[in-house]
Amino acid sequence: RHSFPTRRSSDLTSSEQQKQLPLIYPLLISLLSGAVFSFALAPYYYWWLALLSPALLYACLRKRSARQAFGIGWAYGFGLWFVGAFWLYTSIHVYGDTGAALSVVMIVIMALAMGLFTAVQTWLYRRFFPETPLTFAPLWIIFEWAKTWVFTGFPWLFAGYAFTERYLDSYAPLFGVFGVSFAVILLACALVEILNRRWFWAIPSALLVLGAWGAGFIQFVQPKASKPLSVSLIQGNIPQDLKWLTEYQIKTLEIYVNLSRTEWGRDLIVWPESSIPLFQTDIEPFLDAMNAQAKKTGTAWVTGIPYWDLPESKREGQPMYYNSIMALGDESEGLYKKQRLVPFGEYIPLSGMLSWVLPALQNDPSVSGFSRGASDQKPLLIKKHDLGSAICYEVAYPNLTRRNARQSDFLVTVSNDAWFTGTAGPWQHLQMVQMRAKENGRWFIRATNTGVTAFIDHNGHIVKQAPIDRKAVLRGELPAMQGETLYMRLSDWPVLGFSALLLLLGWFLALRANRPLAAGLLAGAALTVEIPVGAMLGLTGGIFYLAAWRRDGKPQAFLRF
């Protein structure tokens, strides 16, 4: 019974409430805990903070009322988003022509709004569920998932990203970033329970670690027999304050043409997002010349370009503008229109109310004029291969990238992170690309304006990386992959379904708080799934480790599904 506290906040006695620390202490601890969480992510990589931060929040909620839990969660969420997403300040202040004080105020408002996710999460936790990691962790995952779609979504600062290229990321090909987050949060809460001498929690913790070890030996994909493509990624380093100026447009094209001059003859050349700062109809002679040059040299050319057309829509006669990727050249064709747009980067939420605050952004076609592309777009055709596409912010959406990856041999993302240069934003962005590559078992090439331009393999490792904030050409090989990861097939539903089941059982447990059978039901249901899965993954890892050992001491094995 001690391992599974079952009382809700309303059940606390007056003596227990008197023993609690004043509310100001958990509020401050939660605020600081949320603030330090982002240092677990790129570019700092203090991964252990991703365990410590939620562990402190979990501890602060112990025996607190639902109302107090709301405030504690809001403090945590505010600290998390104010520090973790402060890189938005550069976009709003430097490139949005907004005063410094007002820019900070806007970041505060954003952090307060996003912090409500955690506030509602912790309120629900203390109002309807028993105090146990088996309800805290599922609620955390449900609210991470909600951030991918509520108000178009802002899917940033997930716990699972802290373990990119670290031990627990072996769960990514199985269950995606939410599966990694679930493991992180459950381990964090279990640590608190173990420190409180609830030794039972050593069992699920050990199973999670064992399962991660075994999952690391499972290979869902393997390279195709075809020869890898030779690829050149072009990084133009165009200053954002000059990029859309009419007098600088030709200079921008000259920079990219000159950087590409020695790359013709390679299989693929990739220019970054909106590297052509003109609509396709305004620059047709240039596109025709580049297409002819690419075909002449046997090269495929992929470039970011703003695109407009007149689709059938309710706004009859009104052109629709898109942030897009275009493929031209030898054995290459296709057009991809961006589906997910960046708030304050490509469109302005509540633009009618905020236009007086952000006059410069309203006049920038890269910000205020773009529409969303269709969800059923085909991959680009490159040298008889299918190239899945993602533009900038889209790689933050796991399921969107998964859909594109299912029909692709490899993936490309183009981006312009000059909006956030000199901040943690571009590095957090790159870390997400690494997780998407790991989830889907596909190589990812990333071409950016100012960085970070990189080649990322199907295991999420950075193979090559260009220096940031300078002109560069990054050359590498791009192998086509075949096969599907479990995550690619099943999406987020296994993790979301398991989380929903635990919450349903936890709610039932809270209603029947005085019945030992109900407490055992929650523990038993969780372990019924976790024990065989953890044991299976651990056993699989052991078999692979022993049976596939080679002279160099590195196990190589493939498990085909």
Protein language model regions, located:
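Membrane-embedded alpha-helical bundles of multi-pass enzymes
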Residues: T13-F220, G422, V433-R436, T448-I456, ...
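Short, small-residue-biased leader/transition segments that mark boundaries at the very start
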Residues: H2-S9
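Short, conserved active-site loops that position catalytic residues or coordinate cofactors/metal ions
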Residues: L41-L56, L80-W87, Q235-N237, G265-L278, ...
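Acidic/histidine-rich helix-loop elements
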Residues: S91, P239-L253, G352
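A short, well-ordered alpha-helical element
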Residues: E254-G265
